[in-house]
Amino acid sequence: MSDLSGRTTVVAGASRGLGRGIARAFAEAGAPVVAVARTGPALAELATTSANIRTEVADAADATVAWSLLDRYEPEVLILVAGASPVMRPLQHQTRETFSVNWHTDVKIAFTWLGNALLKRGAQ
């Protein structure tokens, strides 16, 4: 990965899996990383892996969280991997309700964060 020194990066959904890996990779490349997730202990452990990682325990689906963190950190890079954990079963066994929880949560997070990021940029 190229040098990302000084390129503040917010990773929503950073406590595990892909989000955690992305946060670590960006921090190793020199980016100041703000790792956001609902899981405090997992974020605390992540922060011990790099001095470039600071954490925010918060729900990425909350619109006030998105606006507040975008305003506070003014990231150049925004990575959204937060979302609802899906009910794992074959599609033909999903109900509208089980499918909708994931879809609504994931779309809401993307819409909220990207909308706020674009509004903030447009206001400058």
Across the structure, where does each feature detected by a protein language model lie?
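Catalytic Tyr-X3-Lys loop
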Residues: 92-112
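Conserved NAD(P)H cofactor-binding loop of Rossmann-fold oxidoreductase domains
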Residues: 81-88
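Conserved Rossmann-fold cofactor-binding substructure of NAD(P)-dependent oxidoreductases
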Residues: 61-74
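Conserved glycine-rich Rossmann-like NAD(P)H-binding loop of the short-chain dehydrogenase/reductase
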Residues: 29-45
